[in-house]
């Protein structure tokens, strides 16, 4: 029906225009030096290889990328990070964490440490919370799952 398709279009627009709040958990190969932090980089997407990379601000086509993280659990070799995206770039979390020296466990594309040993894990990255304004009532709505990663 027309009403529900309009609502769906509004939700889609919020996600595409970065108006929706998106949160993730990731298990990293390595532990960040700081328990809380912000990663700010410039990313360039390569459509031919379906990858992105960190580049200098002056690189043609580079786009600003920013995320905030907090360590929620860790052991000697891994950490569980709670991540909030301020921007939503192609493979942003994967690229920025790898560039920071703490790639995601199971990331065959950006975790070059793991490429040598292949853990057999899938990509340990999970969207756990999304928030947006209800298209009709404009009330803030949030949907969340529990942290799926235990270390």
Q: In which residue ranges do the predicted regions lie?
A:
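RNA pseudouridine synthases
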Residues: 1-151
